[in-house]
């Protein structure tokens, strides 16, 4: 596990402990489980991706991200609601919203604002280590959570997945290498993200997705993440029968993120 990932996970553990002191898991869980209207308002994350792909289009998870540990501030003029609206207008299937405060300058409020601005399903993009965070995510309006295999053992991953599924949420499991893929394939979720960024070196290569593809069962929906910068990158993936993408920085650096999405996939 990389030093930066270790550091993030340690901070996450402190954050969750502090949150539980402010509000207990039992209290949060009872509120979420009692809110029938919120459950009825869940948006179908996987369904939105598959619907786009079935129509011959790319299934794009468009990310709303202000900053990152490796790049610093990515988008100084940061208006989550406007970005979400632009993404929806230009054909995104789903949104991914960073909620990590310390390392990515995200916020739960950004997720709420983005979801309120459009009808797209929303992923809480964060480092999930405790069921408490899943109940948080649902209370904020998230429809899907992310599990990063590099930071979790199988028992905890299975527990977190089961918690999300009980709440009607989808789960995107993220891998970077063969060992992580083996662990991910033990889960029930069909959403499999391949991160082309090495979390140890932060180097990126689309070859990561291409190398792992032959080992991924056909029922899994493969989502290639990071390193998609040009239309040629998109073509390379689609020629390999990868039609789902999670893209953040490329869109965030453009004057209009939605128009950049349209340019990249036109």
UniProtKB/Swiss-Prot annotation:
Enzyme type, top EC level: lyase
Amino-acid biosynthesis in keyword set: yes
Reaction catalysed by this enzyme: 1-(2-carboxyphenylamino)-1-deoxy-D-ribulose 5-phosphate + H(+) = (1S,2R)-1-C-(indol-3-yl)glycerol 3-phosphate + CO2 + H2O
Gene Ontology MF terms: indole-3-glycerol-phosphate synthase activity; phosphoribosylanthranilate isomerase activity
PROSITE patterns: IGPS (PS00614)
Alphabetical UniProt keywords: Amino-acid biosynthesis, Aromatic amino acid biosynthesis, Decarboxylase, Lyase, Tryptophan biosynthesis
One GO BP: L-tryptophan biosynthetic process
Domain of life: Bacteria
UniProt pathway annotation: Amino-acid biosynthesis; L-tryptophan biosynthesis; L-tryptophan from chorismate: step 4/5
EC id: 4.1.1.48
Keyword Lipid biosynthesis in record: no
HAMAP family: IGPS_B (MF_00134_B)
Family (UniProt): Belongs to the TrpC family.
Name by which UniProt lists this protein: Indole-3-glycerol phosphate synthase
Organism annotation: Herminiimonas arsenicoxydans
Gene: trpC
């Amino acid at each position: 596990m990389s030093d930066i990932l270790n550091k993030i996970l340690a901070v996450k553990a402190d954050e969750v402990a502090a949150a539980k002191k402010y509000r207990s898991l039992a209290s949060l869980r009872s509120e979420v489980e009692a809110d029938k209207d919120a459950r009825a308002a869940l948006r179908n994350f996987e369904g939105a991706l598959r619907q786009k792909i079935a129509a011959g289009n790319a299934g794009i998870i468009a990310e709303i991200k202000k900053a990152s540990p490796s790049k610093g501030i990515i988008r100084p003029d940061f208006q989550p609601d406007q970005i979400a609206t632009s993404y929806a207008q230009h054909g995104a299937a789903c949104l991914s919203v960073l909620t990590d405060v310390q390392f990515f300058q995200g916020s739960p409020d950004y997720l709420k604002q983005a979801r309120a601005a459009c009808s797209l399903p929303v992923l809480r993009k964060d480092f999930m280590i405790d069921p408490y965070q899943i109940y948080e995510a649902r209370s904020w309006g998230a429809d899907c959570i992310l599990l990063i295999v590099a930071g979790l053992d199988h028992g905890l991953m299975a527990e977190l997945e089961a918690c999300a599924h009980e709440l009607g949420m989808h789960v995107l499991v993220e891998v970077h290498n063969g060992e992580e893929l083996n662990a991910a394939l033990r889960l029930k979720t069909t959403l499999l993200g391949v991160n082309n960024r090495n979390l140890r070196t932060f180097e990126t290569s689309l070859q990561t997705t291409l190398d792992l593809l032959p080992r991924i069962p056909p029922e899994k929906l493969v989502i290639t993440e990071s390193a998609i910068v040009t239309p040629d990158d998109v073509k390379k993936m689609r020629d390999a029968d990868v039609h789902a993408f999670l893209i953040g920085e490329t869109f965030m650096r453009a004057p209009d993120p939605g128009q950049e999405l349209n340019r990249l996939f036109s």
